A protein has these predicted regions:
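Charged docking surfaces used in two-component/phosphorelay signaling
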Residues: 17-25
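Acidic, metal-coordinating helix/loop segments flanking the phosphotransfer/catalytic sites
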Residues: 32-50
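Acidic catalytic/metal-coordinating carboxylates
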Residues: 34-38, 61-67
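Active-site residues of response regulator receiver
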Residues: 54
Length: 140
């Protein structure tokens, strides 16, 4: 696995540290973001491979933040994984609309986090290979 970066966006310092520990032990580089209002700029400047974010945060909820990330050309392809202790069926359409690819229910197991991140990176890499392959066919 090449070195991949995960941006973790959460207003809870304990959650940030726990997720940092899980992902660092799995070989990922992490960017910890507790500044919810500045999170979009941090994502734009760092372009992580995956974003892992809490949905319930003060000032800006995760849906609004995901939507803001997806409206920026440079970051709209970054997979977003939402975390929350509360998920309802009516959230599914909102998650799709905001570009959230996957969700993890809190409390989570470390393997749930690693599995979700690895699957998003794998799906993103597969999409890039298919896009590159299609481009090569067009050029031929």
């Amino acid at each position: 696995m090449q070195n991949r970066t995960v941006a973790i966006i959460d207003d809870n310092q304990d959650s940030l540290k726990e997720l940092e520990k899980i992902l660092t032990m799995a070989g990922y580089t992490t960017i910890l973001v507790d500044d919810i209002l500045g999170a979009v700029d941090i994502v734009i400047n760092n372009k992580p491979d995956v974003i892992l974010m809490e949905l319930k945060m003060p000032h800006k909820n995760g849906f609004a933040l995901a939507d803001a990330v997806n409206r920026v050309f440079e970051t709209k392809k970054i997979p977003i994984i939402a975390m929350s202790n509360l998920f309802k069926d009516e959230f599914k359409w909102l998650m799709d609309f905001c570009g959230i690819k996957r969700w993890i229910k809190k409390p989570f197991l470390p393997l749930d986090v690693i599995w979700a991140v690895e699957n998003e990176i794998e799906e993103d890499s597969q999409w890039e290979m298919e896009r590159h392959s299609a481009g090569m066919e067009i050029m031929a």
